[in-house]
Amino acid sequence: MGLLEAFLNWLRSLFFKQEMELSLIGLQNAGKTSLVNVVATGGYSEDMIPTVGFNMRKVTKGNVTIKLWDLGGQPRFRSMWERYCRAVSAIVYVVDAADPDNLSVSKSELHDLLSKTSLNGIPLLVLGNKIDKPGALSKEALTDEMGLTSLTDREVCCFMISCKNSTNIDQVIDWLVKHSKSKN
């Protein structure tokens, strides 16, 4: 980054604060909490405890403050997903791209959620996680398996990531920052 660009970014940060609220959803063991930790600290741990209910964490990237709702993915918590997805800047749906056995359930849960009228038009970011594992789907295969091309009522974006290796995490953060709302 050049000196002039750095100065302009600093100047902008004095006058413009950006905020966004996100809901991270997906089936259990997809890597939602790992994603929160990688975005917040850059750290990854193999020993994750399943999220019971939800966790909230605020992360600041540059002049953007991101409020992350990390929602449990077990069947008993899925009914509360809609409540935490209303009025967010974007819905982030995490999929274990190396677990083909759960893709049909994951697709069904996603499409059921997005059919709720309270969520109309909210941008969707689908993250195929665990691409470091053998047999992980490609972006094209995940897009097809999840029926993402049929979602025409909102912006839909898909990235393939690895929380373990931090693969494409910068792209995810860039997408999130671009979808934040200015608060001056």
UniProtKB/Swiss-Prot annotation:
<keyword id="KW-0206">Cytoskeleton</keyword>
<keyword id="KW-0498">Mitosis</keyword>
<dbReference type="GO" id="GO:0009506">
    <property type="term" value="C:plasmodesma"/>
</dbReference>
<dbReference type="InterPro" id="IPR044154">
    <property type="entry name" value="Arl8a/8b"/>
</dbReference>
<dbReference type="GO" id="GO:0005525">
    <property type="term" value="F:GTP binding"/>
</dbReference>
<comment type="function">
    <text>May play a role in lysosome motility. May play a role in chromosome segregation.</text>
</comment>
<feature type="binding site">
    <location>
        <begin position="29"/>
        <end position="34"/>
    </location>
    <ligand>
        <name>GTP</name>
    </ligand>
</feature>
<dbReference type="GO" id="GO:0005765">
    <property type="term" value="C:lysosomal membrane"/>
</dbReference>
<keyword id="KW-0458">Lysosome</keyword>
<comment type="function">
    <text>(Microbial infection) Component of tomato mosaic virus (ToMV) RNA replication complexes. Required for tobamovirus multiplication, especially for efficient negative-strand RNA synthesis and viral RNA capping.</text>
</comment>
<dbReference type="GO" id="GO:0003924">
    <property type="term" value="F:GTPase activity"/>
</dbReference>
<comment type="subunit">
    <text>Interacts with tubulin.</text>
</comment>
<dbReference type="InterPro" id="IPR006689">
    <property type="entry name" value="Small_GTPase_ARF/SAR"/>
</dbReference>
<dbReference type="GO" id="GO:0005794">
    <property type="term" value="C:Golgi apparatus"/>
</dbReference>
<dbReference type="InterPro" id="IPR027417">
    <property type="entry name" value="P-loop_NTPase"/>
</dbReference>
<dbReference type="GO" id="GO:0005819">
    <property type="term" value="C:spindle"/>
</dbReference>
<feature type="binding site">
    <location>
        <begin position="129"/>
        <end position="132"/>
    </location>
    <ligand>
        <name>GTP</name>
    </ligand>
</feature>
<dbReference type="GO" id="GO:0007059">
    <property type="term" value="P:chromosome segregation"/>
</dbReference>
<dbReference type="GO" id="GO:0005634">
    <property type="term" value="C:nucleus"/>
</dbReference>
<protein>
    <recommendedName>
        <fullName>ADP-ribosylation factor-like protein 8a</fullName>
    </recommendedName>
</protein>
<comment type="similarity">
    <text>Belongs to the small GTPase superfamily. Arf family.</text>
</comment>
<dbReference type="GO" id="GO:0031902">
    <property type="term" value="C:late endosome membrane"/>
</dbReference>
<dbReference type="GO" id="GO:0051301">
    <property type="term" value="P:cell division"/>
</dbReference>
<keyword id="KW-0132">Cell division</keyword>
<keyword id="KW-0547">Nucleotide-binding</keyword>
<feature type="binding site">
    <location>
        <begin position="70"/>
        <end position="74"/>
    </location>
    <ligand>
        <name>GTP</name>
    </ligand>
</feature>
<dbReference type="Pfam" id="PF00025">
    <property type="entry name" value="Arf"/>
</dbReference>
<keyword id="KW-0963">Cytoplasm</keyword>
<dbReference type="GO" id="GO:0005886">
    <property type="term" value="C:plasma membrane"/>
</dbReference>
<keyword id="KW-0472">Membrane</keyword>
<feature type="binding site">
    <location>
        <begin position="48"/>
        <end position="51"/>
    </location>
    <ligand>
        <name>GTP</name>
    </ligand>
</feature>
<dbReference type="InterPro" id="IPR005225">
    <property type="entry name" value="Small_GTP-bd"/>
</dbReference>
<keyword id="KW-0967">Endosome</keyword>
<dbReference type="GO" id="GO:0015031">
    <property type="term" value="P:protein transport"/>
</dbReference>
<keyword id="KW-0342">GTP-binding</keyword>
<dbReference type="GO" id="GO:0005737">
    <property type="term" value="C:cytoplasm"/>
</dbReference>
<keyword id="KW-0131">Cell cycle</keyword>
<dbReference type="GO" id="GO:0051607">
    <property type="term" value="P:defense response to virus"/>
</dbReference>
<dbReference type="GO" id="GO:0000325">
    <property type="term" value="C:plant-type vacuole"/>
</dbReference>
<keyword id="KW-0159">Chromosome partition</keyword>
<feature type="intramembrane region" description="Note=Mediates targeting to membranes">
    <location>
        <begin position="1"/>
        <end position="18"/>
    </location>
</feature>
